[in-house]
């Protein structure tokens, strides 16, 4: 039961960690259930919040509605109450197109028994990729022998992962027809600042990861590939590691430096209001920019010709501290429950740390120890996946009615720092 429950939580939280082999343990009906759970989980907590409101006569109060508007972006470029329909429509469109492309790229030598199996494989992996689910219907996933050299499929899957990690607000801002027409007529108009910051940060992190991955793995996992193939492999891992969990290499065979790089990237995650986990790219960017501003002696945090409100900077710090603190506590608990793994000659603490960050960041990468973990360890990972998927929005939402404001403040006094 614990393995089935673990899988259902992993699918709903679009993580991808699995205590059993999805391709052999579950029938096609079971795999269909996993696919639907990934689809529902990928719609994002905000969409479910509005769906709950539609089904609840009481609906949302002004405070809750304001919080959701604030989470998406203040001065949003679309009405938040139209968000649900837009998210459904866009996600289905992308998944159908992605599934069709994967289907067309399947070659006759691939071991599918029927056309139905090809269609199911295509749809499953399209949904898994776009929703950053990390599950696969074939043994070994994207690292299966018949998929290792299917580089065009790798590119399609990576593109789906990237779109999912960009997030719905970014996609709406960049590709809504009315906004595109408006920008063509008025060239001075540009995408929302949050969109520009998120996309730039995301692409920079991908570029840095690709370069460092190539350096670390050139004579290791990339040893039997040419430059183009190696670049595609590095790009796939650089995109997937931020939350998708699909891999085209054996994670356990990676160099320690690459594992550490992946830990950092999983911790950062994808964009806000996306299918990705982690602290989010905007949080990471604000923390870096704030640090730079402090070093330069600036009083304000400035980005792209705009001053960032102090509240947003404080929120980013809060996300970093709570996310990092929760992850460290859960990692410590795993060292207490998984002593049998630490006692293995080919395993170490970094395997547990990698597994925990993968769960907390809803990434789904594993060095192969998920199935070895005790029921207590799996319980810790289940908790981590739940918390990582819900994130700060749900916590704020739960306590929204209890938020109090005061009309006074205490005198300031400086303390020693550093």
Please tell me what each predicted stretch does.
Residues 1-418:
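Membrane-proximal intracellular helices of multi-pass ion channels
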